[in-house]
């Protein structure tokens, strides 16, 4: 499993992002990560298998300033990733289980000559695979739509650009996303537990 949290605010979002992601901690035990966007993208990823998310990121999150951000707790892949594409730079986090990950990556390598650089335990990072599929689209939205046409299994995506935050889930919603709002600040999460505690 994995847990996602994203936020778009008129002011600095780092504290909301930190606590919102921490409230997803029961969704994964291996990796935690945060990415924010102000003028540039900044990210931090830590192994949380031997320490809680909160203790690993408590000092880091204060330096991640921006009005938009995404966070992830993952059982399988270090995330979020920051990717350069023809749409510009974006950060991406993925939750779910893409059951055709290996065959899809092999097909992309054959068709387009893609090289995958994020390998964990001899498997391609799902976030990198999804990022490459999105980058093949005519736009960010069409790229996200193509992900759901090509994958089997389940997948939810948070994609952060300099312009905003995209949130998407597969048609069946096996890995759901929920949206909350308070005072003009928007959040999206895998589960609502963060919303009650953060006032959404």
Model-derived features with residue positions:
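Conserved short alpha-helical segments that host acidic/polar catalytic motifs at enzyme active sites
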Residues: 1-200
